[in-house]
Structure formats: structure tokens, C-alpha cells
């Protein structure tokens, strides 16, 4: 993502620059698909962990500040993801910096991350994206604990 942002720029990303980022990533994803095959009939969902997808979820939820407990486990349908990416693309660099879910640390990188996600979404169309702010193993453990009734999800239990 950093390399993509450095190569194309991350401050003033036009729709044309964004399309070029997607095309660059799509070439890599397409070679993966050619070697390993697709994912069938589209009755799948994507799982995104940390970084761009958590930023997208935070913006989607219109959080005043990033809240891990609200973002972690969030489901987004394809149209919601698309709308947030379109919003981010329409924002200036300063607008991205001002958003508490993005900030100065990520404002120049978030659109490169969105381009990567868009290339993946085009190669593997699906209706839903699940957002994980925690690692996959931690998320699976939390889910099992919830199913067993030992995790309240309010942050007060491990």
C-alpha cells in the first residue's frame, strides 16, 4: 500500500490516478486468479483485517473518534463499501486528515488501500465485507467465547 501511494501520490488523488492504482493492483490479482482460480458463484463474503477496511467501517459508521469495539465485526454490504470509497475519493487530503478515523498518519495511504480493496472486490465479487480490527485467531476465539456465553462483548471481559 505504501509503495502504491508513493508511486501514484496520496495527497491529491484524482479519479484517473485512483483508476491507475486499481489497474496496477488488478494485474497482480488477475495473475493470482489465473494461477489459483476464482471463488465460484459469488456466494461468499470478504473478510478484511485492520488498516483500510477498519478505516472504511469507521467512516461508514460516522464515528467521531475511532471505536474498535464498534468497528470490529462490522458487516458492510457491497454498496456501502462503494459509497464510502467514493466519499473518500471526493474528499481533499485535508478532509481525510480531519476525519478522526483516518488522521494525518493515514490520510495519504487510505486511497491506495481502497484501490487494493477495489481490485480484490472486482476479482472476487461478493455482497458483503466483514471487518475485523483484531487478528483472525483472536476474532475466532472471541466468536467461540460469545457462542459459549462467556464473552459479553462490552470490553469488560477478556
Question: What are these model-derived regions, one by one?
Answer:
Residues 1-158:
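Helical "lid/coupling" subdomains associated with nucleotide-phosphate turnover
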Amino acid at each position: 500500500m505504501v509503495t502504491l501511494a508513493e508511486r501514484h501520490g496520496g495527497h491529491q488523488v484524482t479519479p484517473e490516478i485512483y483508476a491507475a492504482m486499481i489497474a496496477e493492483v488488478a494485474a497482480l490479482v488477475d495473475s493470482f486468479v489465473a494461477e489459483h482460480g476464482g471463488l465460484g458463484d459469488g456466494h461468499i463474503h470478504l473478510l478484511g483485517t485492520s488498516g483500510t477496511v477498519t478505516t472504511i467501517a469507521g467512516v461508514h459508521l460516522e464515528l467521531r473518534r475511532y471505536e474498535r469495539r464498534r468497528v470490529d465485526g462490522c458487516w458492510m454490504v457491497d454498496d456501502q463499501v462503494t459509497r464510502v470509497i467514493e466519499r473518500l475519493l471526493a474528499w481533499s487530503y485535508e478532509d481525510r486528515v480531519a476525519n478522526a478515523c483516518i488522521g494525518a498518519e493515514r490520510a495519504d495511504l487510505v486511497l491506495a488501500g481502497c484501490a487494493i480493496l477495489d481490485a480484490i472486490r472486482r476479482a472476487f465479487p461478493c455482497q458483503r465485507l466483514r471487518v475485523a480490527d483484531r487478528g483472525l485467531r483472536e476474532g475466532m476465539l472471541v466468536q467461540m467465547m460469545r457462542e459459549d456465553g462467556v464473552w459479553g462483548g462490552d470490553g469488560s471481559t477478556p
